[in-house]
Amino acid sequence: MRDAGGGDGAEEQQLDNFNIPPSNPMTTRLWAGSYVGIGAANLVLQKVPGISSMSEAVRQRCLGEAKFLRAKYYFDLVRAFGDVPLLTTPPASPAEAAAIPRTPTTQVYDQIIQDLTDAAATLNDSYGGGDLGRATKWAAIGLLAKVYLTQGNLPLAAQRAREVIASGRYSLWADYGDNFKVANENGKESLFEVQYINGLNEYIFDGLGFVG
């Protein structure tokens, strides 16, 4: 049964006031969800190189996508929490995972930058049809520009952003509001866009109908 009622937005108010207790579900969802994604990416990076039946093109695409997503999840984590445990291989047990200490922010950013650089060198320029929504070379470079900007490295942020602009694949809508029209999904401003389908559930936080 779905609860159609409202709420007082207490969790959002805590974020707005920069007074966030450990029990705030928005932070715990970000932490847990990111590490689920990181774990999946690490499994791909560990297992895919050994799959002999896979073509080299698909193998490289899978590895590039895994590095892109791992970087994206760590970028979300490091901005929210600062120092976080850095896992680049699957732990052998829950106990091993729990014992991994927090890694300094600078090292986490180094891994993010390396992953995005590797992904940009591997991924295709674009995808269509059933592959629409996969991470592309330009999504990786665009995210890398944002990472450099967050670090305050303006020259490298500008350099990477100019690469995306110079590709000629993206441009701005004359009306910013056009970004949010259903007809313009995966439009000319979109570097990376999560694909959804209707009808799986109506719960707004977990279990969304993601096609991936």
Per-region residue spans from a language model:
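Generic structural signal for residues positioned in beta-strands
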Residues: 14, 85, 190-193
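Short, well-structured active-site flanking segments
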Residues: 78-90, 154-161
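Generic alpha-helical propensity signal that fires on short helical segments
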Residues: 84, 91, 104, 207-212
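Glycine-centered flexibility sites
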Residues: 64, 82-83, 133, 212
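Conserved, well-structured interaction surfaces
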Residues: 5-81, 97, 103-110, 116-129
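An aromatic- and glycine-enriched ligand-binding surface/loop that stacks and positions planar moieties
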Residues: 1-5, 109, 117-120, 134-212
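Short glycine/proline- and charge-enriched loop/turn segments
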Residues: 90-97
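Glycine- and aromatic-rich loop/turn segments at beta-sheet edges
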Residues: 85-86, 90, 120-131, 171-177
